[in-house]
Amino acid sequence: GASGQALLRRLATLEQQGVEALFGEPALQLEDILRTEADGRGRIHLLDASRLVHEAPKVYATFLLWLLAELFEQLPERGDADKPVLALFFDEAHLLFADTPKVLQERLQQVVRLIRSKGVGVFFVTQSPADLPDEVLAQLGLRIQHGLRAFTAKEQKSLRAVADGFRPNPAFDTLTVLTELGIGEALVGTLED
């Protein structure tokens, strides 16, 4: 029926973006990225997806959803732990949500929300928080915001929204601080005091 046709169209789009090359790659083993040193220290793994992000963003989003879903399914519940089992940093995170089908965005948001209980920290790195969906921003336990500049009315509105995302602090005006931060300086906000 209609849903079958929609699925075929989506598969055709992924195929046009080169998804078959992704399936031809050696399998990513989660044990490899979860392995620690003998003294308990973690390892750093860099997955360079820069080409994939720009040439096939839907394939990139699909891969990340698969990775997060696999971690969610395979890792046991941990609750609040002293240190995470894994920390994932997604650079150019706005590309995960730009032009991605709504159903994929919703699934990404759901998995990101639930995966914290498995000991996985997810960090979204982007030039502007306004580029991320409100549903994702609402889940952030930690915000590290470098200085923002706003020249147009749209940028000023976006800046106010970013400032409003921080808990109020009587010691300073968040909006002013965000525009005055220098190179290497950042405003840090947490859910807890």
Can you annotate each of these PLM segments?
Residues 1-110, 179-182, 188:
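P-loop NTPase motor domains
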Residues 110-192:
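Conserved ATP-driven motor cores of ASCE-family P-loop NTPases powering translocation/secretion/packaging/pilus
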